[in-house]
């Protein structure tokens, strides 16, 4: 068993499959809310919410596992397909408004469409190469780990580098964080009840990645609060001077 075809799962996993599907739906709901929220925020604030490289990596991963190596689980495939469609909207908004964030770097500002295209192509071929190297089932999970770490670290770095909550919100953070936590729950069930194929999820590197995700994404909320308070203090200072 390669761990990708759920119909081949042992009876122990089949018994908890409804709960696993619930986690998958939770993951999908969280990320759909996040993607829709990012598109809305991008057009409202004329900026982009997801850092460039994580966005390219994420959409490339979704293309690979919706088109080239689709899951045999209808629930999982449906969630990925919906996420991919909305993610194209995220990418479109990012291409339109990203130049407003790069006026300090003219070379980047003038070539952002090319940067997005090359980034997606690079990560797409990387995910395909990983699938060819270790098989789609393992590459699916390891590729998702890479996407998640890039999203977590990239999101925090973007918040701190901007020094502004522009393009971000508690809703975007929590939908992303809780959606990814549902992925952890789904993976935990596979590890516990399908060890023939998923015992490797208890490996040191996976546990390290989980710890980094929880630490970085958990600290995002704290950093967001501090940046928000700083913005409020600046506005109050300006209002006081104007009086």
Swiss-Prot record:
Disulfide bonds: none annotated. It is a multi-pass membrane protein. One of its GO terms (cellular component) is membrane. It comes from the Eukaryota. Keywords: Lyase, Membrane, Transmembrane, Transmembrane helix. Pfam families: Pyr4-TMTC. It is found in: Membrane. Terpene cyclase; part of the gene cluster that mediates the biosynthesis of the indole diterpenes janthitremanes such as shearinine K or shearinine A. The geranylgeranyl diphosphate (GGPP) synthase janG catalyzes the first step in janthitremane biosynthesis via conversion of farnesyl pyrophosphate and isopentyl pyrophosphate into geranylgeranyl pyrophosphate (GGPP). Condensation of indole-3-glycerol phosphate with GGPP by the prenyl transferase janC then forms 3-geranylgeranylindole (3-GGI). This is Terpene cyclase janB. It comes from Penicillium janthinellum (Penicillium vitale). The lineage of its organism: Eukaryota, Fungi, Dikarya, Ascomycota, Pezizomycotina.
